[in-house]
């Protein structure tokens, strides 16, 4: 699931 989480991001890249 796409989540805006810093620890757990599947479809989001950690900036």
Curated annotation (Swiss-Prot):
The keyword Secreted applies. Keywords: Neuropeptide, Secreted. One of its GO terms (biological process) is neuropeptide signaling pathway. It is found in: Secreted. One of its GO terms (cellular component) is extracellular region. The keyword Secreted applies. Its main location: secreted. It comes from the Eukaryota. Belongs to the FARP (FMRF amide related peptide) family. FMRFamides and FMRFamide-like peptides are neuropeptides. This is Extended FMRFamide-12. It comes from Austrophasma rawsonvillense.
